[in-house]
Amino acid sequence: MSTLREFDENYKQIIVGVDEAGRGPLAGPVVAAAVMIIQYFKELEEINDSKKLTEKKREQLFELIIEKCVVGIGIADEKEIDEINILNATFSAMRRAIKKVNEKTAFDIVLVDGNHKIREYNGKQEAVIKGDSKSLSIAAASIVAKVTRDRMLVEMSKEFPEYGFEKHKGYGTKLHKEILLEKGPCRYHRKSFLSKIL
């Protein structure tokens, strides 16, 4: 049995794992996912932290998780990030993701990646530092959040091809910063993140 699975099963409760993607980028939304694994299936053995997986493997696991687990996705766009700051926007996205799972089924506890409990969430929860490499449910949520956000940035790149969103996914790479200095921001950029660059 995988250690990630053991970690979850030790709780002896119905768990929802929560993680986010996109707290650091200069553009695009922050995306949160909440995942409840109803029944263990063999392919879950391949899951670990989404950052350690290839893009192709993440995509394959994403499809399986969506098909076989209870999944909720929450989004806070760049406008909301600018209005309430990235941490609060992340919590908003997480609450939206959990609400979508809650609309489908009941659960006992939320395990959230990181060292912050979700603000204004009144259910039972626990913050798990490096949770995406400890908990199977959080690792699954990590994959769903990352793939969902990456796909959104690819779509944004069709509207604004000159920014190369499909390559850097909105992160502050050298290329992205150079394009920003040359062209200025588009509507998907987080204005509150650009003060040190522009």
Which positions does each model-derived feature cover?
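RNase H-like, Mg2+-dependent phosphodiesterase core
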Residues: 1-198
